Amino acid sequence: MTLQHTRRIVKSLFILFIIVVCIYLLPRVAINAFYYPDNKVYGPTPAEAESITFTAKDGTHLHGWFIPTAFGRPENAVATVIHVHGNAGNMSAHWPLVSWLPERNVNLFMFDYRGFGESEGTPSQEGLLDDTKSAIDYVRHRADVNPERLVLLGQSLGGNNVLAAVGHCVGCANMRYADQAGIRAIILDSTFLSYSSIANQMIPGSGYLLDDRYSADRNIASVSPIPVLILHGTADHVIPWQDSEKLYALAREPKQKIFIPDGDHIDAFSGRYANLYRDAMIKFIQTALSAK
């Protein structure tokens, strides 16, 4: 074998190595572009909040708040809402959007994913799913919570995590079956269809790099018979409202959709609309709870 031939072989192997590394790393780099965590404090901790540290299934320590109903004992509340936020900020930034819930005789549990706020770790698809499942399990086992009256509220990216946590991936080689015990209703606010669809909107063709097993479109049908409420503003500048229209078509009954004229991203429960969509959410929860 000549030296020139040897060099060609080494060069070919090196190129092959680079290709393999890129195939392995590019999807991880692409998905990490979805997460914008920070530990900035956007406002004071609610006076009535119990600061919680709980542990994800892989041992990561996570931070949360439990805010009890403003009316009587927590175990007698209408329901306990588990809030699952989006891909940026932390729960202190999202608190103003859900601060009204305890005044509706509802307990509220908020938490930060790994890498967000005071939670340890680094964000990843698998990690955020673990965190969401662990938050549900934590609330389910609190002594002062009725474990049969749980409601999941997922906003933006949080909707994908909610659906992946309590559903299974349709069409995936290894289906994930999840524990739906006590989950009586799911609310999705400004949720995107899939990771790949959002990536393709930003960079055409880049969606092929992403793992869609945890995407809303793969999981929404399998959460049935849990009732699903879908909300989305028609002027959302982050996630196209048509994503929610497609998710509604994929969802099974019972389901309900509310499209907010000129509504922006996750502002259904802001003060912009007074109590209009807040009342709609509470009515949906009450109807779901009375179903069985």
Swiss-Prot record:
GO terms for cellular component: membrane. Gene3D superfamilies: alpha/beta hydrolase. It is a single-pass membrane protein. Keywords: Membrane, Transmembrane, Transmembrane helix. It is found in: Membrane. InterPro entries: AB_hydrolase_fold (IPR029058), Hydrolase_4 (IPR022742). The chain crosses the membrane at residues 13-35. Belongs to the serine esterase family. This is Uncharacterized protein YfhR. It comes from Salmonella typhimurium (strain LT2 / SGSC1412 / ATCC 700720). The lineage of its organism: Bacteria, Pseudomonadati, Pseudomonadota, Gammaproteobacteria, Enterobacterales. The gene is yfhR.
